[in-house]
């Protein structure tokens, strides 16, 4: 007897002007790859397929893609059937987004939860930092706050539950972990994740009119350590416009600032 496909897509109506295609019930790179594969296919179809002509925003999440359309210009039922068929064809090849190498400072009040996490895991603080620096994180989705990246790839031994009592104020650009996820708070806000460091890089910048959010689903992120002095120097350069975000793209021919 054939086993059921646990990643088989489901089609869900989100009001009368949006469809959601959902894959499985777990968060994994394979599931997210199907989501991103479907998003790429729909983005191409918007250019030359009349059925997709009124499609607007595409919203990928951990395990689903929501597609907004104009119900006055589109046969919603036909669009839904086509989406479901495309979802069934979506492969699990990982979406290759951009690769970033971003600075982070782990010193002092930038990392208030680092000592507690290290103690809970029976590791030295240096060992926790080493594991974070050795990992490559994958952006699954942007959510919670504008530009807030939910990233998989956290080493399992560093998994940590959210704080029992969330902080009323988390500083902008704080590197944080919760459960098996890693994230960066692009804005000052309340939050319950464990704060392990801070980056001088602005992950959301309204001056970047075309794409204010720096990271996107499918991107990869690696971290490199900087001192407090280096952090402040980089922050000044970034805020002054001397160090554009593209400087942190990882490429064979490009050396990131240090």
Language model feature labels by segment:
Residues 2-258:
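Glycine-rich active-site loops that engage anionic ligands at enzyme catalytic sites
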């Amino acid at each position: 007897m054939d086993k059921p496909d646990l990643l088989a897509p489901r089609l869900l109506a989100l009001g009368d002007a949006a469809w959601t295609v959902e894959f499985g019930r777990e968060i994994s790179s394979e599931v997210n790859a199907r989501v991103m594969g479907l998003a790429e296919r729909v983005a191409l179809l918007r250019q030359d397929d009349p059925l997709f002509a009124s499609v607007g925003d595409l919203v990928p999440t951990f395990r689903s893609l929501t597609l907004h359309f104009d119900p006055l210009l589109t046969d919603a039922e036909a669009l839904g059937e086509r989406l479901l068929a495309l979802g069934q064809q979506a492969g699990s090849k990982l979406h290759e987004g951009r690769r970033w190498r971003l600075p982070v400072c782990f010193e002092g009040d930038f990392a208030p939860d680092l000592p507690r996490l290290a103690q809970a895991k029976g590791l030295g603080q240096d060992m926790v930092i080493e594991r974070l620096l050795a990992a490559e994180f994958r952006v699954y989705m942007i959510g919670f706050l504008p530009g807030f990246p939910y990233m998989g790839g956290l080493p399992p031994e560093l998994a940590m539950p959210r704080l029992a009592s969330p902080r009323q104020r988390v500083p902008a650009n704080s590197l944080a972990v919760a459960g098996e996820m890693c994230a960066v708070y692009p804005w000052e806000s309340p939050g319950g994740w464990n704060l392990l460091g801070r980056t001088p890089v602005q992950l959301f910048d309204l001056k970047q009119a075309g794409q204010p959010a720096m990271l996107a689903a499918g991107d990869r992120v690696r971290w490199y350590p900087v001192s407090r002095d280096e952090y402040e120097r980089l922050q000044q350069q970034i805020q002054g416009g001397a160090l554009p975000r593209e400087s942190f793209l990882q490429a064979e021919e490009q050396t990131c600032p240090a």
